[in-house]
Design a protein with these regions (language model features):
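Short, surface-exposed alpha-helical recognition segments that flank or form part
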Residues: 9, 32, 58, 151-154
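Short beta->alpha connector loops
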Residues: 38, 64, 180-182
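Extended, H/D-rich, highly charged conserved domains that either
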Residues: 1-10, 44, 48-142
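Short, basic/glycine-rich phosphate-binding loops at helix/coil junctions
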Residues: 17-23, 135-144
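N-terminal accessory alpha/beta regions
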Residues: 1-31
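SIR2/sirtuin-family catalytic core signature
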Residues: 150, 155-157, 161-197
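Surface-exposed cleft-lining segments at the edges of enzyme active sites
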Residues: 28-35, 145-151
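A short, well-structured juxtamembrane/interface segment
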Residues: 33-48, 155-163
């Protein structure tokens, strides 16, 4: 996960620090009650939802649970494709640690049974604060050489492939928010899709 000469203890301390920061952010988000800002966020997410004939998705490098929290508040089902987990509106809301399989058959596809009209396919390209491997290690990709780590985790590798596929669909619209263009594996996909268009 981290490049450089870090001891196993240092690596664990870094992971725990990252998890604590995300936990603190989650607590702050839950108590944030500015109606207009929350409403704006909900309305924006609805623009990315799918219905049976839609094709919207969000691909993110963020590892927090901000989107999941706001989807729940907006009665939007938030689905992690290929992961047997989704957050359903009108149900008690809790972001638990989610077990991520270390192997995914190329034929295995989790199809969420959505109960409502609005659902959001949410691809977390660098893992998530609430994702756990079978070993109970967190699945957070940080630091340099991210592609090597992504290729070690089938779910992230599949998400990378899905990102490339979405970018290359005809008439794709891409909205980039808060990305500093420091991840070469992402930049390469963007450049290839742009030159192929």
């Amino acid at each position: 996960m981290f490049e450089g000469k870090f001891s196993a203890e240092d690596r664990q301390d870094i992971k725990e620090a990252i998890q604590k920061v995300f936990g603190d952010i989650e607590k702050d988000t839950e108590s944030y009650n500015y109606y207009s800002a929350r409403n704006l966020c909900k309305e924006l997410m609805k623009k990315f939802t799918k219905t049976h004939d839609g094709s919207g998705a969000i691909f993110t490098l963020n590892q927090d649970v901000f989107i999941e929290t706001h989807c729940h508040d907006a009665n939007i089902q938030c689905i992690y494709p290929y992961v047997a987990q989704m957050f359903v509106p009108n149900q008690p809301y809790k972001i638990d640690n989610i077990s991520i399989k270390t192997k995914i058959s190329k034929y295995e596809r989790y199809v969420a049974k959505h109960n409502g009209d609005l659902y959001l396919s949410y691809f977390k390209l660098h893992g998530s604060i609430n994702w756990r491997l079978e070993s109970n290690d967190s699945l957070l990709i940080t630091g340099g050489n991210k592609l090597a780590y992504i290729n070690k985790h089938p779910i992230l590798e599949e998400y990378q492939n899905q990102f490339a596929a979405f970018l290359n669909k005809p008439n794709t619209k891409l909205l980039i928010v808060g990305y500093g263009f420091q991840d070469m594996h992402i930049n390469n996909l963007l450049q290839k899709a742009s030159s192929d268009a």
